[in-house]
């Protein structure tokens, strides 16, 4: 499958990049500092340095920090004419020191601009905000529009807001800044015109698991609907799925997937910017599973959709861009099933080792989501794998070429 949906349609209509001399945007994976214990200001210099260390140690390209700038004390009122300042950090967030430290560790800092739905005020501050980013070494921003749009209670999908999103993308391009927009309108292929508009949320992403939850079939629908318009920042990678772990007031609420399904989402929900959305301490509890997130690519040379039924299941294989590495991700809805995974898309004449991350025999998204198993097998282009998926479960596979010594003692899938 080579189509990028509406992006290709838009291109065929004669539209081209609005910024043909735009810099090379590099895809990457980013740690996400939102799921944190509350009661204090976690977006402080010392704490963020811990995340930079974590990112550096695990090959994560960047760190996205929410809550760095002044205005968060009562931001959910959604009614102030000016809620946030986008060029003024809290006193305990040292912008220049963190940039120095991150650069030393080989990690990019990603800016966050939550507008609390005050899009008009954001436009007034836009040039100052982007200049602040440039002056301090930020090259990417996540924007947010939570609430009722100020000043006129516009819908997020209104013409006024559509014009706003495009205006932000254009001005960001002028400053050579990449944009990942949340609470935005569904995409229509404009990421081809503005290549710095790297991704959007524009559907119920992973954070909605804390607000009533996403049904198990939700991520089996999005690849056939939302994803046709362009990349989605879904924020996968949640290993601790019990919300009671974070909030004792929600003892019976949980993320509606198994741990392995969270890993598979990195393939079924493609985006050139992917989040590593859980706490580092949770990943430390499952280091063998986290290895897959360390290894998985975010940019692809080719993709093969192996089986799919909208709302029920989807299995996709992808080749990492410029590398002889392949990855497979398969997910299912609330029903357990057996996926049929052929490997005929692999180059002929070679043998490969497939590392399979699979749901455990007793895995279930509701009762036992963290049950998983990892095994290695040999595959060839003639192999066909019959793989069991738990209820709202998945499978994630990484594949590399192998020599005879590496294959010794491993089972070959026929």
Question: Model-derived features: where do they sit?
Answer:
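Single conserved hydrophobic/aromatic residue that forms the stacking wall/gate
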Residues: 1-10
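Active-site mouth loops of central-metabolism enzymes
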Residues: 19-47, 112-125
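Catalytic domains of carbohydrate-active enzymes, especially glycoside hydrolases
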Residues: 47-68, 135-139
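Aromatic- and carboxylate-enriched substrate-binding clefts and catalytic-loop regions
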Residues: 66-254
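Glycan-recognition and catalytic regions of carbohydrate-active enzymes
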Residues: 278-327, 362-368
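Carbohydrate-binding surface patches
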Residues: 309-353, 395-398
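Solvent-exposed beta-strand/loop surfaces of large extracellular or lumenal domains
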Residues: 356-382
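C-terminal beta-strand-rich structural cap/linker in extracellular carbohydrate-active enzymes
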Residues: 376-414
